[in-house]
C-alpha cells in the first residue's frame, strides 16, 4: 500500500502497489513516448544551417582554417578563412569519432538511469539521456545566444552525407536536442585535442596513405605546396614538432643537384604534412634509403623534426657576443633544440649547435653582427657576398633612389 497526494485537490489517496506502479510508469514514460512519436521540431529540407557560436569558438575555427590552408581570396585578402570548407573537413573526418565518444557518454547515463529508475522504458531512458547530454552545454548555449555569432553552414558535395545524417536522422529521431548545439559540441570536442592531432584528423586520408607507404617501404610521387611537379620521395617516418605542433614527414628525395645541374642526388628532407598535396601515388622510379640517411633522420627527430640533417652528428660552431647570447632567449622561431656552450674566447662565447646546418644558418642569420659561424668556408663566402651587396646598396643605389624619389 502506498499513500500519494492528489495533484488537483491535495487530498491523500491510498493505492495498492500495482496501482502506484502504473501511475508512476505512465508519468515517467508517456511524455517521452509522445515526443518520440510526434516531434515538434523537424528538418525543413533547407540546405543551409545556422550554427550559433561564441567569439572564442569562431576565432578558433578561423585560426585553424588558415593554419591548415582552408583559405580563399576575399576583398584582396588571400588568407581569409574558408569556414564552410574547414567545417566540412571536420564533419567528414571527425563525425564518426565524435559519435563514438558521445555514445560512450550516453551509455554511462543510460546505465545509471536504468539502475536508479527501473520503471523507465528504453525509449524514455534514451530520450532523458539525450536531454541530459544536451543540458551539459547549457551555460555554453546561453553564452552563444548572448553573443549571437552565426556561422552559415552550406550543404556541399563534400559534406552532404554527414549533413543529411545530422539533419534527418539525429534531429528527426530526437537523438539530439538542437542541430546548432550538436555542431558546437563537436567543435568543442575537436578543439580539446592538441594541434598536431587536429591536423591528423583534418588530413586523415593523407596520413593514412603516407603510413601505408611507410609500412610497405615504397617510394612515392607527391606534390608540395604550389609546385605543380611531382617529387620522387622515399617516406621514412611521421613525427611531431613540439614547439610548432605540426606533423612532419621525414624522408629522402631523389632530385637534381641545384649546384650541379644534370647531376641526380638523394638528400634528406623534412616536409610539413599539411603542405603536401592530396594526391600521393606509387613512384615509377623507386630507390632505397641508406643506413646513414636513416641514422641522420633518426637524429633529426630529437634535434628538430622540422629540418632534416644530411648526415649523422651534423652540427655547427658559432661565436656569440654578449648581445648574441641574450638573443638566444629572445628569438624563438626556428631555434635549434640542442645548443651547448663549449668555450669562452675573449668577448665571444663559442657554442656547438646540433642538428640541421640549414636550420642553424637560418636561425643565426637573424643575429647579425652578434653571431659568427666558424669552420664553414662556404657559409662564410655567402655571407661576405651578401654583406658586400648591402654595402653597395647603401653606398650608391640608395642615393640614386633618393634622388629619383625627390624629383
Indicate residue ranges for each PLM-predicted region.
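Polybasic (Lys/Arg-rich)
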Residues: 302-407
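Short, basic amphipathic alpha-helical segments that act as recognition/interaction helices
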Residues: 31-34, 77-107, 174-200
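Short Cys/His-rich "knuckle" micro-motifs
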Residues: 14-19
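Core beta-strand-centered patch of the WYL/Sm-like small regulatory domain
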Residues: 192-316
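Bulky hydrophobic/aromatic content
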Residues: 117-146, 150, 159-222
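Surface-exposed, Lys/Arg-rich phosphate-binding patches that contact polyanionic backbones
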Residues: 55-82, 157-181
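Short cysteine/histidine-rich metal-coordination sites, predominantly Zn2+-binding motifs
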Residues: 21-28
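Short Lys/Arg-rich basic patches
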Residues: 1-6, 10, 33-66, 108-162
